């Protein structure tokens, strides 16, 4: 059935994994339904991404989304897929998408207790050149008895119940955490199922790669400039860090998780509040990185401690191996002390 052996009789699929986690937590099954619906959407998006050129899904849809990005045709399709799958899971009450200006409130007859924040297709500016892209999501419980509203999504990342991302690269991968470490699943095309490939992934304490868009060096603050200089021209005589930057956050974050090192999208003169969105970009990946033993910071506080004020709020993001992030924070503190 798969290429790994003639026939596997006891494989741990992601569907089975999600059901087992729900059983262990003695839950109602609502989160299980929700995660399985999210996975169905991810499989459908994966299929659409693979067929995009043939189905004329490349190119621009002719609109700009609420955060100022050009909307690609695949973005529109992916957004509709995720919204429809999540609402038909009967487990959500509020959805926040990068593509929608307002929060989406699930109809009463389909309503559940979970809030989902997601970016249906992160890195979609890379679609036309076939670079890796992804889907990112974070799931929260509704904490009030009030009628659902966008306020239900304004929770710090510490409240996340489950989070993950899908990476549509040379294969389709899902990284998922329900608060007990990070597990990686690969889509087996022969089965149409995600199969566990790595359990309880841990990030290296220190890496050898730094990842940021150096094209913005003109706008960097003193701390970022100093840190990058240290990585390129180490004062202790050690080898310089390698530079890697795809420009698709899911791809850059996943490489950082697997190989170690640091990913930076700091505030700069052009984007003083940062560029990446807190609810559906920064929080989910910060949660995954922390669950894997890494650190994720805005430069002034852990990303997961930020109390959101609006659903499309932007924050700086620096994440990766703990020693590397601490070294960056030391540069920040040194430059603040020197002011």
Curated annotation (Swiss-Prot):
Regulation: Subject to complex allosteric regulation. The enzyme can assume an active R-state, or an inactive T-state. Intermediate conformations may exist. AMP acts as an allosteric inhibitor. Fructose 2,6-bisphosphate acts as a competitive inhibitor. Strongly inhibited by Ca(2+).
Residues that hold AMP according to the record: 18, 28-32, 113-114, 141
GO BP annotations, alphabetical order: fructose 1,6-bisphosphate metabolic process; fructose 6-phosphate metabolic process; fructose metabolic process; gluconeogenesis; sucrose biosynthetic process
Positions of post-translational Phosphotyrosine modification: 216, 219
Annotated residues for binding of Mg(2+) 2: 98, 119, 121
EC numbers, comma separated: 3.1.3.11
Signal peptide boundaries: none
Cystine bridges: none
Gene Ontology terms: cellular component: anchoring junction; cytosol; nucleus; Z disc
Pfam families according to UniProt: FBPase (PF00316), FBPase_C (PF18913)
Residue(s) at site: Important for the conversion from active R-state to inactive T-state in the presence of AMP: 33
Region (Important for interaction with ALDOA): 3-10
GO molecular function, one term: fructose 1,6-bisphosphate 1-phosphatase activity
Chain residues that bind substrate: 122, 213-216, 245-249, 265, 275
Subcellular localization, as worded in the UniProt entry: Cell junction; Cytoplasm; Nucleus; Cytoplasm, Myofibril, Sarcomere, Z line
Entry similarity comment: Belongs to the FBPase class 1 family.
Subunit: Homotetramer. Interacts with ALDOA; the interaction blocks inhibition by physiological concentrations of AMP and reduces inhibition by Ca(2+). Interacts with alpha-actinin and F-actin.
Name the UniProt record assigns to this protein: Fructose-1,6-bisphosphatase isozyme 2
């Amino acid at each position: 059935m798969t290429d790994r052996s003639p026939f596997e009789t006891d494989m741990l699929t992601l569907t089975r994994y999600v059901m087992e986690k729900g059983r262990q937590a003695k839950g109602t099954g609502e989160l299980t339904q929700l995660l399985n619906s999210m996975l169905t959407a991810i499989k459908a998006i994966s299929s659409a991404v693979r067929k995009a050129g043939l189905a004329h899904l490349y190119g621009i849809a002719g609109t700009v989304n609420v955060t100022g990005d050009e909307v690609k045709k695949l973005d529109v399709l992916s957004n509709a897929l995720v919204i429809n799958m999540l609402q038909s899971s009967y487990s959500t009450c509020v959805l926040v998408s990068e593509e929608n200006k307002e929060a989406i409130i699930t109809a009463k007859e389909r309503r559940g207790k979970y809030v989902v924040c997601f970016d249906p297709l992160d890195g979609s500016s890379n679609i036309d050149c076939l670079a890796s892209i992804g889907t990112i999501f974070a799931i929260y419980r509704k904490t009030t008895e009030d009628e659902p509203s966008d306020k239900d999504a304004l929770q710090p990342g510490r409240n996340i119940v489950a989070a993950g991302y899908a990476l549509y690269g040379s294969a389709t991968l899902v990284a998922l955490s329900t608060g007990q470490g990070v597990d990686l699943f690969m889509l087996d095309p022969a089965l149409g199922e995600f199969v566990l490939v790595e359990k309880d992934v841990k990030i290296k304490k220190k890496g050898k790669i730094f990842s940021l868009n150096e094209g913005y060096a003109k706008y960097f603050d003193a701390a970022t400039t100093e840190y990058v200089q240290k990585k390129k021209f180490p004062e202790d005589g050690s080898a310089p860090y390698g530079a890697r930057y795809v420009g698709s956050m899911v791809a850059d974050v996943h490489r950082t998780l697997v190989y170690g090192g640091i990913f930076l999208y700091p505030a700069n003169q052009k984007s003083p509040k940062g560029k990446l969105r807190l609810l559906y970009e920064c929080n989910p990946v910060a949660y995954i990185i922390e669950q894997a033993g890494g650190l994720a910071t805005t430069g002034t506080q852990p990303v997961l401690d930020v109390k959101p004020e609006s659903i499309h709020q932007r924050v700086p993001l620096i994440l990766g191996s703990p020693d590397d992030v601490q070294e960056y924070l030391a540069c920040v503190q040194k430059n603040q002390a020197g002011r």
